[in-house]
Each structure stands twice: as C-alpha cells, then as structure tokens.
Curated annotation (Swiss-Prot):
Protein name: Conotoxin Cl14.7
Keywords recorded for this protein, A-Z: Disulfide bond, Neurotoxin, Secreted, Toxin
Residue stretch(es) of the prosequence: 1-15
Post-translational modification: Contains 2 disulfide bonds.
GO cellular component: extracellular region
UniProt note on tissues of expression: Expressed by the venom duct.
An MF annotation (GO) of this entry: toxin activity
Organism encoding this protein: Californiconus californicus
Superkingdom, natural source: Eukaryota
Free-text comment about domains: The cysteine framework is XIV (C-C-C-C).
Subcellular location: Secreted
Length: 39
C-alpha cells in the first residue's frame, strides 16, 4: 500500500464517476470496464 497523491486520488474519483456502470472494485480503461488489480 503506497501513498496516493492528490492528483491520483482525484483521477481515481473521476474514473469511478465516469464509469458508474462498472462494478465495485473495477476501473475504466479506454471506456472499458476492467477489474482493478491495484489495491
């Protein structure tokens, strides 16, 4: 577990909001839903 920078945190929130259709623990990559392997 590393320290999340302010920018990374904001980016993550934007990704989550942009991909609300994705399930929890998933990330949006190029408009596609992918399981988040980084935790």
């Amino acid at each position: 577990m590393g320290d999340l920078s302010e920018a990374d945190s904001m980016k993550h929130q934007l990704q989550r909001r942009d991909c609300g259709r994705c399930g929890l623990g998933q990330i949006c990559d190029a408009g596609a839903c992918r399981p988040s392997t980084m935790m």
